């Protein structure tokens, strides 16, 4: 029965295929406007400002990182991204807003996908596409082929079919990448294997961000937001995407870039960092001289400014990659430190924490347990007496020290590269 089902699915595959997206051809004026935008000075700063004009509230760093990552779908080795945060923190909203800037023909949006679905796309249907997954829980069944598509940039599946004479034969279904994958989840630990292949972005869950969003919502309801102008900016971004062309990138400074020793899993983190530097170079392609190597291949070169921009944008990503705590637990610990400073008390109990931080008791218990297990807090009291535990922070400045070390390391790399260029050891 399985063979018959596979046979039926193969026969019906063409009929079930969605209609192919027609590529929008730009008018000469649209192309000229898009290229002119890419040639303007301070491109990243200007892009960040324009993103805020598209209805994206706050999240300036996260939105710029995500946009640059989405650009890499056109390259041979794209980057991938994962949005993390508590339920209702705006993960899916941010992904949707950024993906609206990508042409429809270049993206595939998925809410839920079945186990073998990826194998039944046409061979090049996913090539250089952006795959958007609303919630990673909905793609749990395809995690293995999805990881293979991310890493090896192609997947294949061999199935058994019957020919017209009833004889069994095998065929291999092959789907080619590369693809750029973007997804959202609240479960950082569960999807750790997938997270290792992605740049991790944690949504802004501060009260200031809540105020910014509420203010935008009230302005929207009052008719004070120019929706037509927002759409015009979105169309401009889509046209910018259409004029970006694949091109080889060479980073002459790559061998001088060394990750901080504090970073966990340095091999994949280094790949992500170098890839993001190339993403910035790729986005600046209309401002770079196109060169030709000995084999006749065209390429552009990474500048020191690209590396500096990547270090600045990915600073928090590198902090999280160097922290053994999850982002949620880290934020809880930093809130405890702030609470200790405000109250002037070195110790606090569960009731005080819950009342002051206004948080769910279950989450609080989990965070306290994790912090105690890793040695960040010390608990004293009677385990048989409810509410008797008193907690104290072991070291108040450990995170600031970690961030300072990483910051100094990145600055020393930039200073070293500039010195090499100045001395003529590296040709700029």
Residue ranges and their predicted role:
Residues 324-428:
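Terminal-proximal interaction/regulatory segments of ATP-powered molecular machines
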Residues 29-34, 46-53, 80-82, 128-133, ...:
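Short hinge/gating elements
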Residues 55, 64, 69-228, 238-243:
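Conserved ASCE/P-loop NTPase catalytic core
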Residues 16-60:
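Charged, amphipathic alpha-helical linker segments immediately N-terminal to NTP-binding catalytic cores
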Residues 61-73, 100, 274-279, 334, ...:
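Contiguous, well-ordered alpha-helical segments that form the cores/surfaces of helical PPI scaffolds
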Residues 171-179, 186-334, 338, 420:
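Phosphate-sensing "switch" segment of ASCE/P-loop ATPases
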Residues 99, 274, 365-369:
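Short, hydrophobic-biased segments on the C-terminal half of alpha helices
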């Amino acid at each position: 029965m399985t063979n018959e089902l596979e046979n039926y699915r193969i026969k019906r595959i063409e009929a079930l295929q969605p209609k192919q997206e027609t590529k929008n051809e730009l008018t000469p004026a649209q192309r000229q406007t898009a290229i002119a935008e890419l040639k303007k000075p301070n491109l990243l700063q200007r892009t960040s400002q324009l993103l805020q004009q598209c209805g994206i509230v706050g999240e300036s760093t996260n939105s710029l990182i995500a946009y640059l990552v989405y650009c890499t779908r056109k390259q041979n080795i794209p980057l991938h991204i994962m949005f993390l945060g508590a339920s209702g923190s705006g993960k899916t909203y941010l992904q949707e807003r950024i993906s609206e800037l990508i042409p429809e023909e270049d993206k595939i949006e998925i809410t839920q996908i079945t186990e073998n679905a990826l194998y039944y796309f046409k061979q090049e249907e996913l090539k250089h596409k952006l795959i958007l997954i609303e919630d990673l829980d909905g793609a749990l069944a395809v995690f293995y082929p999805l990881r293979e598509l991310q890493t090896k940039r192609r997947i294949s599946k061999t199935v058994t079919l019957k020919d017209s004479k009833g004889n069994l034969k095998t065929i291999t279904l092959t789907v080619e990448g590369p693809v750029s994958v973007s997804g959202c989840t609240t479960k950082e630990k569960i999807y750790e294997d997938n997270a290792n292949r992605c740049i991790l972005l944690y949504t802004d869950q501060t009260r200031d961000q809540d105020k910014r969003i509420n203010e935008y919502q009230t302005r929207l309801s009052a008719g004070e937001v120019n929706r037509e102008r927002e759409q015009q900016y979105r169309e401009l971004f889509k046209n910018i995407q259409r004029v970006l062309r694949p091109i080889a990138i060479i980073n002459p400074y790559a061998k001088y870039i060394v990750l901080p020793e504090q970073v966990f899993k340095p091999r994949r983190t280094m790949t992500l960092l170098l890839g993001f530097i190339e993403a910035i170079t790729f986005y600046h392609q209309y401002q770079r001289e196109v060169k030709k190597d000995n084999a006749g291949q065209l390429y552009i070169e990474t500048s020191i400014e690209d590396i500096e921009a990547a270090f600045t944008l990915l600073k928090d990503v590198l902090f999280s990659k160097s922290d053994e705590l999850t982002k949620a637990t880290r934020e809880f610990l930093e809130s405890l430190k702030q609470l200790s400073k405000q109250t002037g008390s070195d110790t606090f109990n569960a009731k005080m924490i819950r009342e002051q931080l206004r948080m769910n008791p279950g989450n609080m218990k989990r965070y306290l347990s994790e912090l105690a297990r890793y040695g960040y807090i010390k608990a004293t009291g009677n385990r048989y007496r409810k509410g008797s535990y008193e907690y104290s922070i072991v070291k108040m400045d450990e995170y600031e020290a970690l961030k300072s070390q990483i910051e100094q390391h990145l600055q020393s790399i930039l200073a070293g590269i500039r010195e090499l260029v100045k001395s003529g050891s590296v040709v700029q």
